From Swiss-Prot:
WD repeats lie at residues 114-155, 157-197, 201-240, 243-282, 288-349, 351-390, 395-434, 436-459. CDD domains: WD40 (cd00200). Transmembrane segments: none annotated. The gene is nudF. Self-associates. Interacts with nudE and dynein. Residues 9-41 form the LisH domain. It is found in: Cytoplasm, Cytoskeleton; Cytoplasm, Cytoskeleton, Spindle pole. This is Nuclear distribution protein nudF. GO terms for molecular function: dynein complex binding.
Length: 459
């Protein structure tokens, strides 16, 4: 008799095996085992058979489930141990105080619910604690991310809202939205989010919209394969850029406003020089993914110190690099690629188990964050060749469609008239280097998904 089981447990096991064999018409085997154990047929009446005939199968399937759960927990333990191993004693104590090394963690500070369908996009107000979300329910909702409260619901679009973005124009901070209804709408936050303009011109769903820094312009990307540049004041389309052969899924302007990065269904990412709006120039086409490119991002200058060595740039030359030196793309092939401006792929980040839906660079420059249809958010350390150092598993209950980092807070400092204007974009690209402004990183990240939720991660 097994020393692992008590006498009662052994008897239960024997009865379960005999009942299982009998239920599956293995009567000879059941009779042989019953004889070997010295059990009479009277022991197995109808009631006993019913009780034990499925017990063995239930035990077996429960063991398989437990084994899977154990394996998942072991994998999570390994990931957490790796994160601990990568952290120095000082970094562990300072991480919460140092914005440059802060990373989001679960649980989220708030999980905001009000949308009735998939939340496709989010955008932070550049100054206040407001955040906008757009949904398949055709609505835009404005929230206070510090308080976790709904402030307003904007109605105007007639189909899914696919993109939102805050930006600073001549008239102040504005909110732009785009939709499957083929329109772009501009809303004025200082006037109760009044819809002040509707831009028409695209011939299919408008998938992304972004303000172009410092130029009173908007750029939009569409399923009609075009990029369009719009004058925010007049609402006129000032230029249509053609080049993609499929749906343009995403567009991202450079921090100085002179370049556009676009990507989409033709499995390419393209860099455009729009210094001269009337004559945009295609500068670069990046090819390397194996499936649709869902998202793209321009690296901030704070990332250059980590990425430049991979591109063969010497340390002393990093400060001389331009506004668009490195970019990242996320694809349905489950990978993220980081490129230099020559079109060389510096690294391919592998780890997600499903489509990559959104990517964002940490304002401090050291990390790249991504979200995926595998319901996780991953943090990649660019100083360690893109190693995944943190995973927020099950960050949402379904696919994660959007991920944004709150823009930096810029505090102007006094400077001489000839020392540069001291201004910076939302990710810290300095425009005046003699007396740079005080740029404060806001440790706030938002994600949104098919579970109809908007999650806020904050320090």
């Amino acid at each position: 008799m097994s020393r692992l089981l008590t006498i009662r447990q052994a008897e239960e096991l024997h009865k379960s095996i005999i009942a299982y064999l009998s239920a599956n018409n293995l009567t000879n085997a059941a009779a042989a085992l019953r004889a070997e154990l010295g059990l009479s047929e009277e022991v197995f009446d109808t009631g006993t058979m019913v009780k034990y005939e499925t017990l063995l199968e239930k035990k077996w399937t429960s063991i398989v489930r437990l084994q899977k759960k154990i394996m998942d927990l072991e994998a999570r333990t390994v990931a957490l141990q790796t994160e601990l191993n990568n952290a120095t004693p000082t970094s562990l104590s300072k991480r919460n105080q140092d914005p440059a090394s802060w990373l989001p963690k679960v649980p989220a500070r708030y999980s905001l619910e009000s949308h009735r369908s998939t939340v496709n996009c989010v955008a932070f107000h550049p100054k206040f604690s407001s955040i906008a979300s757009g949904s398949d329910d055709s609505m835009i909702k404005i929230w206070d991310w510090e308080l976790g409260e709904l402030e307003a619901t904007l109605k105007g679009h007639t189909r899914s809202v696919l993109g939102v973005d805050y930006g600073t124009a001549q008239s102040g901070v504005l909110l732009a939205s785009c939709s499957s209804d083929l329109s772009i709408k501009i809303w004025n936050p200082s006037d109760d989010y009044k819809n002040i303009r509707t831009l028409l011109g695209h011939e299919h769903s408008v998938s992304a919209v972004r303000f172009i820094p410092g130029r009173n312009l908007l750029v939009s990307a569409s399923r009609d394969k075009d990029l369009r540049i719009w004058d925010v004041t007049t609402g006129f389309c000032v230029k249509t850029i053609q080049g993609h052969s499929g749906w343009v899924r995403d567009v991202c302007p450079s921090f100085d406003g002179n370049y556009l990065l676009s990507a989409g269904d033709d499995i390419t990412a393209r860099l455009w020089d729009i210094t001269n709006i009337s004559n945009p120039e295609a500068k670069l086409t990046m090819v390397g993914h194996d499936h649709v490119i869902e998202c793209c991002a321009v690296a901030p200058q704070t990332s250059y110190q980590y990425l430049a060595p991979m591109a063969g740039v010497k340390k002393e030359a990093v400060s001389k690099l331009g506004a668009v030196e490195f970019i990242a793309t996320g694809s349905r092939d489950k990978t993220i690629k980081v490129w230099d401006r020559r079109g060389s792929c510096l690294m391919t980040l592998v780890g997600h188990d499903n489509w990559i839906r959104a990517i964002v660079f940490h304002p401090g420059g050291k990390y790249l964050l991504s979200s995926s249809d595998d319901r996780s958010i991953r943090c990649w350390d660019l100083s360690q060749d893109g190693k995944c150092v943190k995973t927020l598993s099950e960050a949402h209950g379904h696919f994660i469609s959007s991920l944004r980092w709150a823009p930096n807070v810029v505090k102007e400092v006094a400077n001489n008239a000839d020392s540069g204007n001291g201004k910076t974009d939302s990710n810290g690209l300095l425009k005046g280097k003699d007396n740079p402004p005080n740029v404060q990183i806001r440790c706030v990240v938002a994600s949104a998904g098919v579970d109809c939720k908007l999650n806020i991660y904050a320090n």
